[in-house]
Amino acid sequence: MVAFVKARRQIAGVKESKSLLPLALIGISLLYVGLIIIIPAANVAVQAFSEGLSGFIKNLGDRNLQEAIRLTLLMGVISVPLNTLFGLAAAFAIARKQFPGKSLLLSVIDLPFSISPVVAGLMIVLLYGRNGWLGPLLESNDIKIIFAWPGMALATIFVSMPFVAREVIPNLEEIGTDAEEAASTLGANGWQTFWRVTLPSIKWSMLYGVVLTTARALGEFGAVSVVSGSITGKTQTLPLFVEEAYKQYQTTLSYTAALLLGGISLVTLVLKALLEARTGRQSRIH
Amino acid sequence: MSLRLPSLSFTWLTRLSWSWRFTWVYLTLILFIPIIALFLKSASLPLGRIWELATQPVAVAAYEVTFGLSLAAAALNGVFGVIIAWVLTRYDFPGKKLFDSFIDLPFALPTAVAGLTLATVYSDKGWIGQFIAPFGVQIAFTRWGVLLAMVFISLPFVVRTVEPLLLELEVEAEEAAASLGASPSETFWRVILPPILPGVLAGVAQGFSRAVGEFGSVVIISGNLPFDDLIAPVLIFERLEQYDYAGATVIGSVLLLFSLVILFVINALQNWSSRYNG
């Protein structure tokens, strides 16, 4: 027993401590994270393949599932570029200026992270819905936003708005203006300076933000659920499909969609880790 | 020379001042107008009606469940988050890297997937639920399930806010305390905890705020029974489904006001934390 403990302690890299404390703390951490995260995560894969590989492939052929995939990708294609553009613009507008209310503005940009997704969706319904402020105007022009993809896109943009901005702003503050001023002195115009000097030096933080934006945009449930009406095969993204299939007792089909989303989040985590290694920064969450 | 530098940076800024305009237009369209739409809708109701809708028994019960369980989840993660952050910064063990990246999973995994798999694993016949069911405790479709989902989605916050603070902590101080005869628990309470406390509280507040607003994972694992395990965001959703816009708006405004207050608190805690750690 003593030898065992000693060996464990050496694995743990704790030599001078005479207590079992490190081992106990590692055990508690593993148990907590295991019960709450790791086992449930493993369950997604096991359930998706509960009818075997052929069952999984058959489920992938489900017409409504494929429609959900298409719509999910559409959400990403719309919201990621727009929010990236916003993040860059906000960074250039804010990062290098000192003005009263700067920290307030930074908090305002972060607001979508603290607003409940359901409340975000509610706001969009109150604005664009049939009984909303712009409802009559939209109806008379035959534009449908709520219960259709434009509203879902607005909801997705809302919830994933801050990621790029909050990654690029500190980066831009950090790198300073020396290189840009040098480029300017050498005759580069504003856009040349931007493309050749500024953008290369913020590209990793921007990519980090883009990865997080994409993950959130493809995975959003609450806000999209409120504005979409979740009409199967029409206004259902993958996360909505997961819930609907589960409610219809099509558990394996539900887990098939869940595994696709889980795959996206695994890719997200890998990219996140790679980018963190490259930028040498700590893992941050929002 | 003294003239050149300011003029250079100034032309740079004016050339890119589209960025300033774009930022404000985007914020206005995406963020400000929807928020104003919500408050205007609330304000269009008579004051008495607002009060009546905001404090109807089913809503009050939903606030209690939402805030109570969110606080419990955030507190649990406060305790375990500090332990996990400590383990990640001080010890080495096989598979640590993998373990580390699992911590971020709640942040990357769509909430619907989290709700689905937690509901399965913790159901009476699930991998974990089957061992708890014999004790007469049902987790899925009860308040326990709601708590579990909230613990899941707010788990990373404390870990990730405390980790950098623990890395900065000087080991010498701990060693000095130990060599002066302090027990491990004394060292923890007197030497380690004080400098990381603002960070812990900021992480707890962030987790709390996230849990209060959570919808996707909770709606799947909860029984959504009024006066039992129905949370406020689900109540808003149901009100909207019944085309009760006034009810949804008022309860939504309560949650939004709460978000603004907690955002202020988190900012204050973060300022305190960064002042504390210089």
Curated annotation (Swiss-Prot), chain A:
Q: How does it assemble?
A: The complex is composed of two ATP-binding proteins (CysA), two transmembrane proteins (CysT and CysW) and a solute-binding protein (CysP).
Q: Where are the transmembrane segments?
A: 20-40, 74-94, 108-128, 145-165, 207-227, 255-275
Q: Which family does it belong to?
A: Belongs to the binding-protein-dependent transport system permease family. CysTW subfamily.
Q: Which is one Gene Ontology cellular component term of this protein?
A: plasma membrane
InterPro entries assigned? CysW_permease (IPR011866), MetI-like (IPR000515), MetI-like_sf (IPR035906), Sulph_transpt2 (IPR005667)
Known CDD domains for this protein? TM_PBP2 (cd06261)
**Taking the first listed entry, what is the main subcellular location of this protein, grouped into a coarse class?**
membrane
Which keywords does this Swiss-Prot/TrEMBL entry list? Cell inner membrane, Cell membrane, Membrane, Stress response, Sulfate transport, Transmembrane, Transmembrane helix, Transport
The keyword Transmembrane helix is assigned to this record: yes
Q: What is this protein called?
A: Sulfate transport system permease protein CysW
Give the induction text: By sulfur deprivation.
Q: Which NCBIfam families match?
A: 3a0106s02, permease_CysW
ABC transmembrane type-1 domain location, by residue?
A: 69-272
The molecular function terms of the Gene Ontology recorded here are: ABC-type sulfate transporter activity
Source domain of life = Bacteria
Described function: Part of the ABC transporter complex CysAWTP (TC 3.A.1.6.1) involved in sulfate/thiosulfate import. Probably responsible for the translocation of the substrate across the membrane.
Its annotated compartments are: Cell inner membrane
In terms of PROSITE patterns, this protein maps to: ABC_TM1
Instruction: State the species of origin.
Output: Synechococcus elongatus (strain ATCC 33912 / PCC 7942 / FACHB-805) (Anacystis nidulans R2)
Record's bilayer topology term: Multi-pass membrane protein
Q: Which Pfam families match?
A: BPD_transp_1
UniProtKB/Swiss-Prot annotation, chain B:
Q: Which GO terms describe its molecular function?
A: ABC-type sulfate transporter activity
What domain of life? Bacteria
Q: Where is the ABC transmembrane type-1 domain?
A: 63-266
Protein topology in the membrane = Multi-pass membrane protein
Membrane spanning stretches: 22-42, 67-87, 102-122, 139-159, 188-208, 217-237, 246-266
As for subcellular location, the record says: Cell inner membrane
Give the main localization category: membrane
What single Pfam family name could you report for this chain, choosing any that match? BPD_transp_1
Task: Supply the Gene3D superfamilies for this chain.
Answer: MetI-like
Q: Which GO terms describe its cellular component?
A: plasma membrane
Give UniProt keywords alphabetically. Cell inner membrane, Cell membrane, Membrane, Stress response, Sulfate transport, Transmembrane, Transmembrane helix, Transport
| Inducing factors | By sulfur deprivation.
Query: What is the documented function of this protein?
Result: Part of the ABC transporter complex CysAWTP (TC 3.A.1.6.1) involved in sulfate/thiosulfate import. Probably responsible for the translocation of the substrate across the membrane.
Q: How does it assemble?
A: The complex is composed of two ATP-binding proteins (CysA), two transmembrane proteins (CysT and CysW) and a solute-binding protein (CysP).
Task: Tell me its family.
Answer: Belongs to the binding-protein-dependent transport system permease family. CysTW subfamily.
Identification of the protein by name: Sulfate transport system permease protein CysT
Q: What is the lineage of its organism?
A: Bacteria, Bacillati, Cyanobacteriota, Cyanophyceae, Synechococcales
